[in-house]
From Swiss-Prot:
Domain writeup: Has three domains with a flexible linker between the domains II and III and assumes an 'L' shape. Domain III is highly mobile and contacts RuvB.
Matches recorded under InterPro entries: DNA_helicase_Holl-junc_RuvA_I, Hlx-hairpin-Hlx_DNA-bd_motif, NA-bd_OB-fold, RuvA, RuvA_2-like, RuvA_C, RuvA_C_sf
Name listed for the protein in its UniProt record: Holliday junction branch migration complex subunit RuvA
Pfam families assigned: HHH_5, RuvA_C, RuvA_N
HAMAP family attached to this UniProt entry: DNA_HJ_migration_RuvA
Location in the cell: Cytoplasm
Organism: Bifidobacterium longum (strain NCC 2705)
Subunit: Homotetramer. Forms an RuvA(8)-RuvB(12)-Holliday junction (HJ) complex. HJ DNA is sandwiched between 2 RuvA tetramers; dsDNA enters through RuvA and exits via RuvB. An RuvB hexamer assembles on each DNA strand where it exits the tetramer. Each RuvB hexamer is contacted by two RuvA subunits (via domain III) on 2 adjacent RuvB subunits; this complex drives branch migration. In the full resolvosome a probable DNA-RuvA(4)-RuvB(12)-RuvC(2) complex forms which resolves the HJ.
Region (Domain I): 1-63
Keywords: Cytoplasm, DNA damage, DNA recombination, DNA repair, DNA-binding
TM annotation in the entry: none
Similarity field: Belongs to the RuvA family.
Keyword presence, Cytoplasm: yes
Length: 208
């Protein structure tokens, strides 16, 4: 089983990143949140989960151990597969997910594409009491102090798209794709923010 990849980002697509590890390219499915933090040419470390099915072998990737741990808990819930689990992580952070479960907030969970209210209620029923909030928040705080500085430029673009009525997940995917297609490095420079906003809007207007 492949538990972690360390290499260089070859490309970033709508829902995957291609990671070059010693000349071998691994296609890794990732959340929109994580993809927005990657760009071509960047060195990265990705924690992975290998999903084996009759049709394919799929690698799911996470930039933080905390996100992977949350993913593994989600796919233990009956009826929740890797695709929906990753959709949840594109919509809410691990800490937000944990709080939604602890607070019986099915509405917050149901915002994830592909889940629905019944699926959200099932997650709460099966996981409530099994998630340690203090552990998740402690890990998130530690990750925040050790990772690269916050990409405020990307945040500005995403917030701008949200203010225009787009969903957060779609906005994050559009920004990641715009940067990848036009070789725009991240974290975004202040001067690149207007350009990326225009490019992301153009992508979304084409039917993303």
């Amino acid at each position: 089983m492949i538990g972690m990849l360390t290499g260089r980002v070859e490309s970033v697509e709508t829902d995957t990143a291609l990671i070059d590890v010693g000349g071998v390219g691994y296609e890794v499915r990732m959340s929109a949140t994580d993809l927005s933090r990657l760009h071509a040419g960047q060195d990265t470390r990705v924690f992975t989960y290998m999903n084996l099915s009759q049709d394919a072998i799929t690698l799911h990737g996470f930039l933080d151990r905390d996100a992977k741990k949350t993913f593994l808990q989600l796919i233990k819930v009956s009826g929740i597969g890797p695709k929906v689990a990753q959709s949840l992580l594109s919509t809410l952070t691990p800490s937000q997910l944990a709080h939604a479960i602890a607070d019986n907030d099915a509405t917050a969970l149901a915002k994830a594409p592909g889940l629905g209210k019944k699926g959200a209620q099932k997650i709460i029923l099966e996981l409530k009491g099994s998630i340690d909030l203090s552990q998740i928040e402690g890990a998130s705080a530690q990750a925040a102090t050790s990772k690269s500085p916050v990409d405020t430029g990307t945040e500005q673009v995403v917030e701008g798209l949200i203010s225009l009525g787009w969903r957060q997940q779609d906005a994050q995917q559009a920004v990641a794709e715009a940067c990848a297609e036009n070789d725009i490095p991240t974290p975004l420079a202040t001067d690149d923010v207007p350009r990326v906003l225009r490019l992301a809007l153009a992508l979304m207007d084409r039917g993303r």
